[in-house]
A protein has these predicted regions:
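N-terminal hydrophobic or amphipathic helices and topogenic motifs
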Residues: 2-92, 277-305
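Periplasmic-binding protein-like
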Residues: 51, 55-56, 131-141, 168-170, 196, 267-283, ...
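A ligand-binding cleft/hinge motif common to bilobed small-molecule-binding domains
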Residues: 109-119, 178-181, 207-208, 212-232
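Bilobed "Venus flytrap"/periplasmic-binding protein-like clamshell domains
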Residues: 47, 52-75, 87, 110, ...
Length: 305
């Protein structure tokens, strides 16, 4: 049975609950070269500034414009200085939050699971609502260059493949689970495996001919498609996953409870134009809980077998 059929109903049940409640390193472990030591005390401390890390979903120029607007909104709403930093990698955002060098981070679902494994006191606060579906989920897709002779997943063997990051959910984890189900081992069966570092960069590598197929989130694919960058006579969507819980904004245990509540309300009440900071088509935020990401844990566990 396909892993996505196996967990599909679980995913939908979990996600409906969300919607209506408001390369030596092992890529599946939460370990890092950094020790990620936790603070010696979990006591609440006065907060005079909020620092937030954000994973690099799309080109930094566009994302930085959106970040500045969100910074200004949160600073005004919370009456506290808010500084948002776009990190150079997924792992950098994970490390900053785990080690509590920032109070908040915008992470992918798998990045959150990795961070939570290293710092159990972390918790998801909100996730964005997908504009096209009005639901807090999205999907992973694989886009192929048909001129390379690729029309389905089996055709990927012997071709060059692009992932986003080993900490990316839609750009690595979910696609890897599908490959495992099909007994495809990327490092063995593909001519080359590349990691672009961002979803837009992964599609740019496909267009440039650096890779023959790429795993990305469907949102970024649709943006490129709408812009005419992926003409149908050359590029084809050859696979799409079942729904994945959307990327959470995760908070540190050092934040006072009252501030956590204020942050959650601020995000949920944010104007629509301020919720697209991850390069996604979002219409708002909804509250989420740790158990909403159990599907990702199950996929991770299956891959570790």
């Amino acid at each position: 049975m396909s892993i996505f059929k196996q967990f599909g109903l679980v995913a939908i049940a979990l996600l409906l609950g969300v919607a209506f409640s408001s390369c030596g390193e092992n890529p599946f472990s939460g370990s890092s070269q950094s020790n990620g030591s936790l603070p010696s005390s979990n006591a609440e401390k006065p907060v005079t500034e909020i620092n937030m890390a954000m994973i690099p979903w799309v080109s930094s120029e566009k994302q930085n414009e959106d970040i500045q607007q969100l910074e200004e909104y949160l600073t005004k709403t919370l009456s506290l200085p808010v500084k948002i930093t776009l990190t150079k990698s997924y792992q950098a955002s994970i490390d900053l939050l785990v080690e509590e060098k920032v109070e908040i981070a915008y992470l992918g679902p798998f990045s959150y699971i990795k961070a939570k494994e290293r710092n159990p006191n972390l918790e998801p606060l909100v996730a964005h609502i997908e504009k096209s579906t009005a639901r807090p989920w999205y999907s992973s897709v694989i886009i192929a260059n048909t001129t390379a002779g690729i029309n389905n997943l089996q055709d990927l063997k012997g071709k060059r493949f692009g992932f986003v990051s080993k900490s990316s959910t839609s750009g690595f984890l979910v696609a890897s689970a599908q490959f495992k189900e099909m007994k495809i081992e990327p490092e063995r069966d593909f001519a080359a495996v590349e990691y672009a570092g961002g979803h837009d960069k992964n599609l740019e590598a496909l267009i440039a001919g650096t890779v023959d197929a790429s795993a990305v989130n469907k949102i970024t694919y649709l943006q490129f498609f709408d812009q005419g960058k992926l003409p149908e006579d050359q590029y084809k969507l050859i696979w799409e996953s079942n729904p994945i819980p959307n990327s959470p904004i995760v908070i540190s245990s050092q934040l006072p409870s009252q501030l956590k509540s204020k942050l959650q309300i601020a995000f949920i009440n944010a104007p629509e134009g301020l919720v697209n900071v991850g390069g996604v088509r979002a219409s708002g935020y909804t509250s989420v809980r740790d158990e909403d990401y159990d599907l990702i844990r199950k996929i991770q566990k299956n891959l570790e077998k």
